[in-house]
Amino acid sequence: MMPLSPQLQQHWQTVADRLPADFPIAELSPQARSVMAFSDFVEQSVIAQPGWLNELADSSPEAEEWRHYEAWLQDRLQAVTDEAGLMRELRLFRRQMMVRIAWAQALSLVSEEETLQQLSALAETLIVAARDWLYAACCKEWGTPCNAEGQPQPLLILGMGKLGGGELNFSSDIDLIFAWPEHGATRGGRRELDNAQFFTRLGQRLIKALDQPTQDGFVYRVDMRLRPFGDSGPLVLSFAALEDYYQEQGRDWERYAMVKARIMGDNDGVYASELRAMLRPFVFRRYIDFSVIQSLRNMKGMIAREVRRRGLKDNIKLGAGGIREIEFIVQVFQLIRGGREPALQQRALLPTLAAIDELHLLPEGDAALLREAYLFLRRLENLLQSINDEQTQTLPQDELNRARLAWGMHTEDWETLSAQLASQMANVRRVFNELIGDDEDQSPDEQLAEYWRELWQDALEEDDASPALAHLNDTDRRSVLALIADFRKELDRRTIGPRGRQVLDQLMPHLLSEICSRADAPLPLARITPLLTGIVTRTTYLELLSEFPGALKHLITLCAASPMVASQLARHPLLLDELLDPNTLYQPTATDAYRDELRQYLLRVPEEDEEQQLEALRQFKQAQQLHIAAADIAGTLPVMKVSDHLTWLAEAILDAVVQQAWGQMVARYGQPTHLHDRQGRGFAVVGYGKLGGWELGYSSDLDLVFLHDCPAEVMTDGEREIDGRQFYLRLAQRIMHLFSTRTSSGILYEVDARLRPSGAAGMLVTTADAFADYQQNEAWTWEHQALVRARVVYGDPALQARFDAIRRDILTTPREGTTLQTEVREMREKMRAHLGNKHPDRFDIKADAGGITDIEFITQYLVLRYASDKPKLTRWSDNVRILELLAQNDIMDEEEARALTHAYTTLRDALHHLALQEQPGHVAPEAFSRERQQVSASWQKWLMA
């Protein structure tokens, strides 16, 4: 034993001074004093448990004592009757054994390899004992889990990383994966559980027993993130689920991790052998796999960047020439050649390194240098951690802990130790660079590109200072990192093949560089990640965005401008094809060309395939709406033109739907016989509301009324003849069905037919004569108001002319001014009471006083009031042109008409852009004050005077 340095002797005196009065200090041997001066962990432990000192004196730690751990622990667990007792005994046993290991290590009673063996064996003993005790307890509670043949099913635990390799460090956490063999259910318990439930509950209890801090501390920090799907995956998986995951989705890093996987406890059972056989092909390839080098180089680059980013100086694990680089060197040969060289299929590093040397895979002498460096670094790491039982690999900055490490490493002082350490790490670094290479000599552009890869692949934390996000404020930077982290977690729940992962890893750095260079980075990122989540299993779409940078830029621009567009793309990724050509993306179809475009589009689909026809209609609508929205966002279409395009689109789709419904009805029943000697179908569709008024928005529904001119005695001419009027009723029902059927692309439009005569209680389809009679004799004033905004959007010219005449006759009927004024005003007040603003501290652009509905009521009132004298007022069905007519016919002065038109278009523009943002139609209470004052003044003038 090396004598204590003056500084450590002085520290021992400090320790002695703070020992309890009844502590047997006089009985302490020089070895005990040295270890207590070296390790605060040992000092605190033996103060709490003085009896442990006696055991150390009576039975000095030995290299092979790990073989007794299981028996020693079982003796302690004999009397345990509940989980609290189990947790206490596990913690006390772990602490006592760790004191013995720290003692032996500090005094060099055992070799470094033997220390690693003891630490790993202790962890395995504690894990297996806890599992077995809890398994028995769970079986007592719920019965024994069995397969279909009644054979009991065990919980198998894979120890990963250093635990699996038998190289656990002093204060390590433990990486575990839980598995059970076959599906089934419990038998013999008070309550039956399926095996998945049983093992999940057992796994949760096991983690709690090991990980939960109590007054006695904890056993080990348990990390389950290496399991399939990480934190978002099931806690325990069946063998079948494990095999499916690793065959279909296993990633490079999971393959590397599985090299060290070892089954805890019984390694010779049937199920253990089955699990090992299942995993071996995933880990060790039959062919020589040189792609491993680049993958490991990428991983090493990621770690090097993490060291730089976090300022991890003096890190003996992650730093240049550290423990991780030795592990990488060994893994390169295991993964490249392990499938062909069984000697390389070992979990522990040092035996594998010896096999590498025997196979002459490294230059002469390099394996010996790596072995020496590994043992040096692992001893230094374990000594460092045993000072405070603290998980750290960063060398201390304070003089006391430096003196402790110099003593533990048998050097005169810290400077000597530092020189030895530098020499060892330089040797490792040289071998690593010669084998794997490095990524540190990068140009500024390469470094920036690396930062984007880092941002995607390294799961950065909030305090990581990446130049890529330097321009964002703290809040936005945190938002970006959180969005990326959430997206990665979501990906873990998805079944993504290796090709999909590869394309995604190519795409994401480019996408992040485009998004994060924007000042509003969190906004488009939050909107695009749901889209990406939806397409990650469809590699074609990922490749489209990866291979066409222009499409990616357009996607970001559109999603940043409108969550509505982002949502539409997320729901219907087929629309991504529309992003490929910017010349067409921002150029909507000409208003008079929608019908022809749709006809051409439907030619791609078999006419007899109703399902594909429905799908094609919906896809056409979505693609055209995307073009309209893109032009809208780009500012090339004013709001009135946007509505024109949306209205023309709706009419084209209505035309196609009627044709489709007509064809289906005629195929079934034939056509009504009154059509034999005439052109057309004797059918018309009247558009009301926004459709009738050329004011459709992106999510507007269609207000429709159906008319026909079929005489009462007519039948159809098909084999299954039906009454002609019944034919038109079923035709209208079929049209409604085609609009509202929900396919994978959603519905076409919501259709509302309640504006028909007698509303929901009336016939769905009426004759033109019945419609005229209802309007003349039964309709309410509000129904005549609605007629102002009605026009035929599909139908025979003769029937259209008949409707126009009915509308003109009704609207030009003389009305008593005061009565009309009262009825219109009362209807508006009733609407406001029923539909008024639910947010009193906001202004509802449509429903509140001074809003859009008031303007509509003013124009409708004035048409009904003055059309008897000025029939030209009935010409148009949209508010803007009605206001023009009112001015041209000297009913409203031009200044007021212009002011109301300005207010109307301004408010509609605002409502329209709120819809693009998926925002409700209410704004700050002071908004649009000038426009509202104008509307209120006109309301007062026309409807209150």
From Swiss-Prot:
Cofactor field: Mg(2+)
EC number per UniProt: 2.7.7.89, 2.7.7.42
Stored CDD domains: NT_GlnE_GlnD_like
Listed GO MF terms: [glutamate-ammonia-ligase] adenylyltransferase activity; [glutamine synthetase]-adenylyl-L-tyrosine phosphorylase activity; ATP binding; magnesium ion binding
Gene Ontology cellular component list: cytosol
Pfam families on file: GlnD_UR_UTase, GlnE
InterPro entries, alphabetized: GlnE, GlnE_rpt_dom, NT_sf, PII_UdlTrfase/GS_AdlTrfase
Annotated spans, Adenylyl removase: 1-440
Class of the enzyme per the UniProt entry, highest EC level: transferase
Gene3D superfamilies tied to this protein: 1.20.120.1510, Beta Polymerase, domain 2 (3.30.460.10), Glutamine synthase adenylyltransferase GlnE (1.10.4050.10), Nucleotidyltransferases domain 2 (1.20.120.330)
Reaction catalysis annotation: [glutamine synthetase]-O(4)-(5'-adenylyl)-L-tyrosine + phosphate = [glutamine synthetase]-L-tyrosine + ADP; [glutamine synthetase]-L-tyrosine + ATP = [glutamine synthetase]-O(4)-(5'-adenylyl)-L-tyrosine + diphosphate
Annotated stretches, region: Adenylyl transferase: 449-945
GO biological process, alphabetically ordered: regulation of glutamine family amino acid metabolic process
Keywords: ATP-binding, Magnesium, Multifunctional enzyme, Nucleotide-binding, Nucleotidyltransferase, Transferase
Keyword Zinc-finger: no
Family under the similarity heading: Belongs to the GlnE family.
HAMAP family listed in its UniProt record: GlnE (MF_00802)
Function: Involved in the regulation of glutamine synthetase GlnA, a key enzyme in the process to assimilate ammonia. When cellular nitrogen levels are high, the C-terminal adenylyl transferase (AT) inactivates GlnA by covalent transfer of an adenylyl group from ATP to specific tyrosine residue of GlnA, thus reducing its activity. Conversely, when nitrogen levels are low, the N-terminal adenylyl removase (AR) activates GlnA by removing the adenylyl group by phosphorolysis, increasing its activity.
Protein name stated in the entry: Bifunctional glutamine synthetase adenylyltransferase/adenylyl-removing enzyme
